């Protein structure tokens, strides 16, 4: 069964499954290599039907496949600027709030079209419209090299996708005046960047910031150009004409060089760049973040053991843990310290900054889903609480030994909270108070107590 929607920029046919319709592969922009995205011209004379997920951005396998499991294999293409829209079947135009999802992946991997980000269960339980975004990654999205690319193309893609939502989502049942921008990891990092970008200011009124590695910051122009120089050395040819496989191989070698001895620096080699459009220099950006956060509704938090996803498989720390007695203690202490620097302390700082600027802020935490899993509450364990279903995630190492039924049930509370926030911009649970500056309280979404008192 199918449903056809006519929007200002096109006519699309989606597949109906029960009471939910999914529209795959809707193109929101076009872009030549290293060029800013250009909005697509309206194509109202042609019906577009994409029964399966469209192509994803060129990328190498995610470094977190050993935690999340491998995603379904999807075609890769530079023509990847598409969204997936999931909506209640036959929703009245403009009637429902919208959640726009920005995937993570260290700005190197990921896709809004991955099966793990399927939004059918979330839409069915909450009655919202979900838009999942593909954007350019790695060198093709964030290279900052004079004469080749100004950088921040992936960020521009995301903003252009939000503009597509503003102009078209009403036809799919969404209310463009009630848009919540939600992202995890690099996607959440992007949302924080957008809070300081004027062009993005009016495109969403609510934000959900999940496990943003805010301690990494963004690149300065100097840092970005140094990464570009290393990449160009590794590529050995003009990136404007190189084949994608060569670009990805040189990108991997660049990451290896920047990681240093023992691969101890795991920061992404390519990030949004302060001082290159549309992201202001850091001083101006800080001021804009404070101004743009005022009167917004923001949900922000992270997991208890973010770094376990990175330290668990890391060869240096695997060897350290094998040292009798002191080894596991030392590895654990280093992991906890890095967790505080990259995640815990910056999340606290930004929650305080947002609240001090006049935003309504709620802070959450996530503990382990099963006591016997060695990854604990690692980075990305929040995703199956929202997206996919038990069968989608059944092979994820971070969720063992949970059954598909237990995986599906583990996210019921989180999906209920997220649905309420997207609908109302608030959390009504009296046990979850609004964040006050300097409060250490984070409301736990799993069955364990962390954080301080409210």
Curated annotation (Swiss-Prot):
Catalytic residue positions: 185 (acyl-ester intermediate), 306 (charge relay system), 379 (charge relay system)
InterPro entries, per database record: AB_hydrolase_fold (IPR029058), CarbesteraseB (IPR002018), Carboxylesterase_B_AS (IPR019826)
UniProt GO molecular function: hydrolase activity
Catalytic activity: N-octanoylanthranilate + H2O = anthranilate + octanoate + H(+)
Domain of life: Bacteria
Induction text: Up-regulated by PQS.
Keywords, in A-Z order: Hydrolase, Plasmid
EC number: 3.5.1.-
Entry similarity comment: Belongs to the type-B carboxylesterase/lipase family.
Protein purpose: Involved in the degradation of the Pseudomonas aeruginosa quorum sensing signal molecules HHQ (2-heptyl-4-quinolone) and PQS (2-heptyl-3-hydroxy-4-quinolone) to anthranilic acid. Probably catalyzes the hydrolysis of N-octanoylanthranilic acid to anthranilic acid.
Name this protein carries in UniProt: Probable N-octanoylanthranilate hydrolase AqdA2
Source organism of the structure: Rhodococcus erythropolis
């Amino acid at each position: 069964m199918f449903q056809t929607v006519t929007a200002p920029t096109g006519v699309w046919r989606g597949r109906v499954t029960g009471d939910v319709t999914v529209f795959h592969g809707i193109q929101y922009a076009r872009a030549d290599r290293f060029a800013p995205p250009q909005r697509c011209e309206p194509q109202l004379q042609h019906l577009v039907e994409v029964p399966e997920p469209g192509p994803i951005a060129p990328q190498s396998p995610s470094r977190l496949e050993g935690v999340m499991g491998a995603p379904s294999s999807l075609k890769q293409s530079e023509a990847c600027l598409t969204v997936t829209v999931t909506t209640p079947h036959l929703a009245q135009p403009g009637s429902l709030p919208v959640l726009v999802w920005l995937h993570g992946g260290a700005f190197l991997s990921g896709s809004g079209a991955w099966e793990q980000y399927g939004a059918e269960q979330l839409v069915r339980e909450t009655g919202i419209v979900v838009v999942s975004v593909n954007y350019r990654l790695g060198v093709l999205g964030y290279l900052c090299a004079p004469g080749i690319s100004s950088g921040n193309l992936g960020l521009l893609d995301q903003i252009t996708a939000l503009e597509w939502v503003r102009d078209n989502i009403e036809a799919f049942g969404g209310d463009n005046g009630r848009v919540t921008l939600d992202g995890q990891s690099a996607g959440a990092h992007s949302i924080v960047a957008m809070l300081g970008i004027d062009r993005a200011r009016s495109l969403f009124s609510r934000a959900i910031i999940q496990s943003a590695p805010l301690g990494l910051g963004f690149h300065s122009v100097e840092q970005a150009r140094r990464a570009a120089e290393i990449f160009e050395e590794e590529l050995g040819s003009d990136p404007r004409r190189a084949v994608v496989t060569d670009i990805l191989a040189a990108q991997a070698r660049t990451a290896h060089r920047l990681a240093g001895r023992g691969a101890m620096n795991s920061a992404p080699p390519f990030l949004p760049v302060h001082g290159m459009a549309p992201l202001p220099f850091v001083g101006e950006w800080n001021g804009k973040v404070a101004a743009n956060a005022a009167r917004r509704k923001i949900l922000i938090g992270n997991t208890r053991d973010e770094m376990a996803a990175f330290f668990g498989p890391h060869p240096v720390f695997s060897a350290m843990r094998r040292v009798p007695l002191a080894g596991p203690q030392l590895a654990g202490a280093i992991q906890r310290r890095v967790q505080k620097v990259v995640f815990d302390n910056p999340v606290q700082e930004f929650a305080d900054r947002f609240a001090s600027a006049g935003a309504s802020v709620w802070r959450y935490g996530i503990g382990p889903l099963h006591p016997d899993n060695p990854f604990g509450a690692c980075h990305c364990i929040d995703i199956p609480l929202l997206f996919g279903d038990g069968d989608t995630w059944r092979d994820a190492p971070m969720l063992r030994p949970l059954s598909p039924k237990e995986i599906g049930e583990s996210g019921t509370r989180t999906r209920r909270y997220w649905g309420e926030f997207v609908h109302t911009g608030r959390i009504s649970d009296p046990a979850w108070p609004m964040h006050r500056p300097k409060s250490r309280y984070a409301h736990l979404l799993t069955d364990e107590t962390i954080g301080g008192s409210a």
